[in-house]
Amino acid sequence: MNAFPLSAARAARILVVGDIMLDRYWFGEVDRISPEAPVPVVRVARREDRLGGAANVARNIVALGAQATLMGVIGADEAGSRIKALGAEAGVNDALVIDTSGMDTTLKMRVLGRQQQLLRVDFEQGPSPQALQRLHDNFLEIVGAHDLLVLSDYAKGALTHVETLIQAARQAGVSVLVDPKGHRYKRYVGASLVTPNRSEMQDAVGRWDTEGDLTQRAQALRHELSLEALLITRSEQGMTLYTQHGRQHVDAQAHEVFDVSGAGDTVLATLAVARAAGLGWYEAMVWANRAGGIVVGKLGTSIVTSQELST
């Protein structure tokens, strides 16, 4: 396999738009059960915040050597401030919209004991119509200055009007990669690539009986949405790509699966950088598959660097 195209990636300008969240981790030790209820008591020893959702996609893009601009909606709160600070530290260009209507920035707090997740607490609230309008207006101003658009949909509200974003990007000559959510796939019509996982694909086309059945359903969906390509991420079964040239598959490369959270973000980021660097869909899938195999061996939402991919 050829080396990762780092020199070409450095010139790539990728715009990431979607649902932004903060992943907060509390690490500790468990050595007793609470006398108040039959639950473990975690003695917190370390705290860590990481970029999540679309922000994790942008962070992975930068780690792979490309330029990333992050656009989405955050609240005027502590979690939103942390996202801005962490993005700056990672080298992500900031095009965030701050919702001053009282919106809570999406925050996922995980409590871990002995490297095992014991509890997750979510704080989330959708953006206001005014914030979404500002997001749309800002998007129209900057999308044409980028080589590729990535849409990271976690169904938190930032991509409520995703159809207009895709249309504007294609009119500007910008390719669009989408990580979808839900079963309303007609929202993504006109995108270049959609990357459902196995469960999301079942939501979109129903259960399949054989690989031949899946191929028929996948190609029908690709034609219906006018996609160049459809890529299904299938966990331990690898990845399968569908284009006008047919079906192509790569087997999974993970040696040990430790944590799958954020793995889809890394896969999407790698696909985006590889495509922006001039690689074809199949080559991009091979690199994304390798990146996915690396990141699931790490704890929590993590990144994969170009150096890791090339070794």
What are these regions (language model features)?
Residues 5, 11-14, 23-148, 302-311:
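Conserved N-terminal subdomain of the carbohydrate kinase-like
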Residues 15-17, 120, 147-150, 177, ...:
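Structural motif
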Residues 19-20, 154, 266:
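Active-site metal-binding loops of divalent metal-dependent hydrolases
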Residues 32-42, 195-200, 248-253:
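Short glycine/proline- and charge-enriched loop/turn segments
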Residues 145-158:
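Short acidic, glycine-rich surface-loop motifs adjacent to enzyme active sites
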Residues 156-247:
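Conserved phosphate/ATP/ADP-binding segment of small-molecule kinases
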